[in-house]
């Protein structure tokens, strides 16, 4: 049974993990997991929140949609949020959906519930705003409240008219009508695009190739240059609407018929059905011809047809109550497992990849499949040469789901204990399923990400040294490690394109200004797993200097090595027990076994130790000098919530810590003061329920001023 503390910890993990996958899928068009695995994470989050409603987080995935917009396109605030849909995975889920509609509307048992049903296109959500029938704005969904302005790009898509036409249903469209739908790429067009990109490449081995039609559509629409979008075969299908000044009908089908009459494409398989039985019959018909459709779909969407019922049903946090997406099961095929390779991700995770005899799954030729982790390899007992069942889950990432050649007399396939990229040790922490490379600072697979983190705002914060420059310097061999950043000179920069006297001088000055970073920023910049800003600050305050911190780390490494030597071969129970003992040596409030073990793994790796020593030849972390002022919040716990209008959250935190207060992220019985700005929600209510003192931003400013 899950305890409350375990549930809170798991919800925090799920919030971060789902946000990461949202960013990969919606923001970078590069998903790492299948739709089915993503849906499983969402269902786990929903189940925990249902059991522990008081633990629902402000950043809960149940409240969020998509991913934040990227930086290279202008942002657009949606007049009405572009929400996601809840999912159905079985016939019973659809029956339950109709039942919930009946109960919510208090309908009689004999009153029919009409639905619309249409294929769920696997594309990129887009809104088209027409004013007086003329297209004035197009935007991506983004995070649901803010998207990206893609108007210029959308104007190049043949399916999308510049001006709506009058139709048999309506002489002219309303003054304002925002049409929503999916930008997609047909399967044949996708294959032709990849073939053209391959033919046009100077080096075929380096040719840009899209993984699937959805990625191709998303990457093509979100271009800075509309000319690139125009060269890509994009299409559009309408499925709904957002802000409107008037509606042409009182049913979902009636409005969609009007949209089609105005000149926007609507699915040929959009129909009206009565109740769950007819909905499921249409689902079966669509599923049967799925492979023959010209575009990828991953299910069927049902919506309550009557708009007055839709209005009464309303919305939950991230989805309407009047609609649901009925997902298709994954498609499968048999093939030969030729080999198992290990890929190292940007964060050091080792992922086994199956190399397969080419096989067609759901109309797509599959040659690779994920094996997830060492435990999954053991569960399947797969070895090169086995016949396996491949599943194209969610139409995105193929995976092996069954081994047809299982032989329990064989030894398990040996998962590598060293990183194939750099040779550093691969470690698996207690309770985790993934092996990770411990050679973070020197591992080629991780270097660019580590370098980007090293110079980021909350780490060394080197102004003017962003990801583009990092990638360029790394590609040309100028910066391979953090220490190399400090070896750059103005003369080196001036030999490169687009660098002038002023820009080169400014960057070198910004780099030199960081040769004495605060100890906590230096520690955070190293990118040690589990050592975030707060943990780095706690360790820096406890040990005050790099010398003091390093002495503690050396003692911890010696203790770990002695324990291993005394007991010989280790297991997870031994590792967990040892980690607790190491945490006692670290002796820092808030730093537990997980962090202690991460510190040991990082600094005990010889490659990392060499990289840190090299870095210390270029800079010297500044010692921590406690400068707290006496104040009415000294020794107390403060929580900031809502919007701060005169300062950033980081500035407020720094002020509180300078006054000797501890800043917490959530309200509890141990909280002494809550500073609430506009938009404060559950934290403010909980503070009121617990009788905790509350002040606003002006009151906080007075506390700070009184301590001067």
Curated annotation (Swiss-Prot):
Recorded catalytic activity of this chain's protein: NAD(+) + (deoxyribonucleotide)n-3'-hydroxyl + 5'-phospho-(deoxyribonucleotide)m = (deoxyribonucleotide)n+m + AMP + beta-nicotinamide D-nucleotide
PROSITE patterns, alphabetized: BRCT (PS50172), DNA_LIGASE_N1 (PS01055), DNA_LIGASE_N2 (PS01056)
InterPro entries, per database record: BRCT_dom (IPR001357), BRCT_dom_sf (IPR036420), DisA/LigA_HHH (IPR041663), DNA_ligase (IPR001679), DNA_ligase_AS (IPR018239), DNA_ligase_CS (IPR033136), DNAligase_adenylation (IPR013839), DNAligase_N (IPR013840)
Positions bound to Zn(2+): 419, 422, 437, 443
Cofactors demanded by this protein: Mg(2+); Mn(2+)
Active site location: 120
EC number: 6.5.1.2
A GO BP annotation: DNA replication
Top-level lineage group: Bacteria
Enzyme class: ligase
SUPFAM superfamilies registered for this protein in UniProt: BRCT domain (SSF52113), DNA ligase/mRNA capping enzyme, catalytic domain (SSF56091), Nucleic acid-binding proteins (SSF50249), RuvA domain 2-like (SSF47781)
Keywords assigned by UniProt, alphabetized: DNA damage, DNA repair, DNA replication, Ligase, Magnesium, Manganese, Metal-binding, NAD, Zinc
Binding site for NAD(+): 35-39, 84-85, 118, 141, 182, 303, 327
GO MF term (any one): DNA ligase (NAD+) activity
SMART domains: BRCT, LIGANc
Pfam families found in the cross-reference section: BRCT (PF00533), DNA_ligase_aden (PF01653), DNA_ligase_OB (PF03120), DNA_ligase_ZBD (PF03119), HHH_2 (PF12826)
GO CC terms of this entry: cytosol
Function: DNA ligase that catalyzes the formation of phosphodiester linkages between 5'-phosphoryl and 3'-hydroxyl groups in double-stranded DNA using NAD as a coenzyme and as the energy source for the reaction. It is essential for DNA replication and repair of damaged DNA.
The name this protein goes by in its record: DNA ligase
């Amino acid at each position: 049974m899950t305890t409350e503390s375990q549930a809170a910890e798991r919800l925090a993990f799920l919030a971060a993990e789902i946000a990461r996958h949202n960013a990969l899928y919606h923001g970078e068009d590069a998903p790492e997991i299948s739709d089915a695995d993503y849906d499983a994470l969402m269902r786990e989050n929903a189940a925990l929140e249902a059991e522990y409603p008081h633990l629902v987080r402000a950043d809960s995935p149940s409240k969020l949609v998509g991913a934040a917009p990227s930086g290279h396109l202008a942002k657009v605030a949606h007049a009405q949020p572009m929400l996601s849909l809840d999912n159905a995975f079985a016939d019973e889920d659809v029956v339950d959906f109709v039942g919930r509609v009946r109960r919510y509307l208090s309908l009689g048992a004999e009153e029919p519930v009409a639905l619309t049903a249409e294929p769920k296109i696997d594309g990129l959500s887009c809104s088209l705003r027409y004013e007086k029938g003329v297209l004035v704005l197009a935007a991506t969904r983004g995070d649901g409240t803010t998207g990206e302005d893609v108007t210029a790009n959308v104007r190049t898509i043949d399916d999308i008219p510049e001006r709506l036409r009058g139709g048999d249903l309506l002489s002219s469209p309303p003054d304002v009508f925002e049409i929503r739908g999916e930008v997609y790429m047909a399967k044949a067009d996708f294959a032709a695009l990849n073939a053209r990109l391959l033919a046009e490449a100077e080096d075929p081995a380096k040719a840009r190739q899209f993984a699937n039609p959805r990625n191709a559509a998303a990457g093509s629409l979100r271009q800075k240059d509309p000319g690139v979008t125009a060269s890509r075969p994009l299409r559009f299908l309408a499925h709904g609407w957002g802000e409107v000044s008037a509606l042409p009908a009182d049913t979902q089908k009636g409005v969609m018929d009007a949209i089609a009459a105005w000149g926007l494409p609507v699915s040929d398989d959009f129909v009206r059905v009565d109740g769950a039985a007819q909905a499921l019959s249409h689902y079966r018909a669509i599923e049967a011809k799925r492979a023959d459709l010209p575009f990828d779909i991953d299910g069927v969407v049902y919506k309550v047809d009557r708009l007055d019922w839709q209005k009464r049903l309303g919305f939950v946090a991230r989805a309407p109550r009047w609609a649901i997406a009925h997902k298709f099961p994954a498609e499968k095929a048999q093939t030969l497992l030729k080999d198992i390779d290990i890929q190292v991700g940007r964060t050091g995770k080792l992922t086994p990849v199956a190399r397969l005899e080419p096989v067609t799954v759901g109309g797509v030729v599959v040659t690779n499949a994920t094996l997830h982790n060492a435990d999954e390899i053991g569960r399947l007992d797969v070895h090169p040469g086995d016949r396996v069942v491949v599943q194209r889950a969610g139409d995105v990432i193929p995976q092996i789901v069954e081994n047809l050649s299982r032989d329990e007399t064989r030894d398990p396939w040996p998962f590598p204990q060293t990183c194939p990229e750099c040779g550093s040790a691969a470690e698996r922490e207690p309770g985790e399923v993934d092996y990770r490379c411990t050679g973070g600072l020197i591992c080629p697979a991780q270097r660019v990400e580590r370098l980007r983190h090293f110079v980021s705002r909350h780490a060394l914060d080197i102004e003017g040294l962003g990801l583009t420059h990092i990638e360029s310097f790394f590609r040309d061999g100028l910066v391979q490690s953090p220490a190399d950043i400090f070896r750059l000179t103005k003369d080196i920069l001036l030999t490169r394109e687009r660098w002038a006297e002023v820009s080169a001088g400014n960057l070198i000055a910004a780099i030199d200004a960081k040769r004495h970073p605060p100890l906590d920023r230096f520690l955070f910049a190293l990118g040690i797993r589990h050592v975030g800003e707060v943990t780095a600050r706690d360790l820096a305050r406890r040990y005050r200097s790099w010398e003091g911190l390093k002495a503690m780390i050396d003692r911890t490494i010696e203790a770990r090595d002695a324990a291993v030597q005394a007991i010989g071969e280790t297991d997870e129970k031994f590792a967990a027990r040892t980690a607790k003992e190491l945490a006692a040596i670290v002796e820092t409030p808030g730093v537990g076994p997980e962090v202690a073990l991460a510190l040991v793994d990082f600094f005990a790796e010889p490659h990392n130790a060499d990289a840190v020593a090299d870095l210390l030849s270029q800079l010297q972390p500044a010692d921590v000098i406690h400068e707290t002022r006496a104040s009415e919040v000294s020794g107390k716990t403060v929580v900031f919530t809502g919007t701060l209008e005169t300062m950033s959250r980081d500035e407020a935190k720094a002020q509180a810590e300078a006054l000797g207060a501890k800043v917490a992220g959530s309200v509890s019985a141990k909280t002494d003061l809550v500073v609430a700005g506009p938009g404060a929600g559950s934290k403010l209510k909980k503070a009121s329920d617990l009788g905790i003192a509350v002040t606003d931003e002006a009151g906080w400013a007075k506390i700070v001023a009184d301590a001067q």
